[in-house]
Curated annotation (Swiss-Prot):
The lineage of its organism: Bacteria, Pseudomonadati, Pseudomonadota, Alphaproteobacteria, Hyphomicrobiales. HAMAP family: Rib_5P_isom_A (MF_00170). Keywords: Isomerase. One of its GO terms (molecular function) is ribose-5-phosphate isomerase activity. CDD domains: RPI_A. Belongs to the ribose 5-phosphate isomerase family. The active site is at E105 (proton acceptor). Homodimer. InterPro entries: NagB/RpiA_transferase-like (IPR037171), Ribose-5P_isomerase (IPR050262), Ribose5P_isomerase_typA_subgr (IPR020672), Ribose5P_isomerase_type_A (IPR004788). This is Ribose-5-phosphate isomerase A. Pathway: Carbohydrate degradation; pentose phosphate pathway; D-ribose 5-phosphate from D-ribulose 5-phosphate (non-oxidative stage): step 1/1. The keyword Aminoacyl-tRNA synthetase does not apply. It comes from Afipia carboxidovorans (strain ATCC 49405 / DSM 1227 / KCTC 32145 / OM5) (Oligotropha carboxidovorans). PANTHER family: RIBOSE-5-PHOSPHATE ISOMERASE 3, CHLOROPLASTIC-RELATED.
Length: 236
């Protein structure tokens, strides 16, 4: 199977977690797009759900596929969020944000009773960090924020190049919230919860791509089939 076929297989399995009447968080990225498309097929067959999109791109996909939408202002909770991931550790802590939607993705995930991450099995890693860690920042004071990030990385025992993400036009990539993204090429993050706390304390940092304690289940598609991993007992 191709990588896209594996992503679609993981998305199809995630549909088994969806029940009639659910309020859903709809993730962003290529794997989440497969889920939205398959969900649309179920909706056309009579499934009643509403979704909260995590990006303008996902909103457009959901509207195209006929998935009814709502907002977090109009519902008091979400039953389930299904989203992709850039890296998944055995703890089910993940790195997300390669598509630039990490702020809305984290807000939606935190508002959900359950978060399921879906991917092909190449995203499964023993230690997070090979994928660049996205940090969403306010454009104002960028130099000061970069210096504070470097200090936080050193305190967490990691180091690496910090680059400003660029869009197709060669200018700074702008998120749906009007912010910029710094990508930290760290290689390895031995203590993700500690680094997450340090990053969250930096003025100028809006959000970061470490999703700690949010995912409850991972669905991984590989050449040997589907593997389902639940968060280890004792983890928050």
């Amino acid at each position: 199977m191709s990588k896209e076929e594996l992503k679609r297989a993981a998305a199809a399995r995630a549909l088994e977690y969806v029940s009639d009447g659910m309020q859903l968080g709809l993730g962003t990225g290529s794997t989440a797009k497969h889920f939205v498309e398959l969900l649309g097929e179920r909706v056309r067959a009579g499934l009643r759900v509403v979704g909260v999109p995590t990006s303008e791109g996902t909103r457009a996909d959901a509207e195209r596929c006929g998935v009814p939408l709502t907002t977090l202002d109009d519902v008091d909770h979400l039953d389930l969020t299904v989203d992709g991931a850039d890296e998944i550790a055995p703890s089910l802590d993940v790195i997300k944000g390669g598509g630039g939607a990490l702020l809305r993705e984290k807000i939606v995930a935190a508002a959900s009773t359950r978060m399921v991450v879906i991917s092909d099995d190449s995203k499964w890693v023993e230690t997070l960090g090979r994928f660049p860690l996205p940090v969403e920042v306010i454009p104002f004071g960028l130099g000061a924020t970069r210096r504070a990030l470097a200090t936080a990385f050193a305190e967490a025992g990691v180091t690496g190049e910090i680059t400003l993400r660029q869009g197709p036009d060669g200018h700074a990539f702008v998120t749906d919230g009007g912010h910029w993204i710094l990508d930290a090429h760290l290689g390895r993050i031995p203590e993700p919860p500690r680094l997450a706390a340090l990053l969250s304390a930096i003025p100028g940092v809006v959000e970061h791509g470490l999703f700690i304690g949010l995912a409850k289940t991972a669905i991984l598609a590989g050449s040997q089939g589907i593997r389902i991993v639940d968060r280890p007992r004792g983890r928050v």
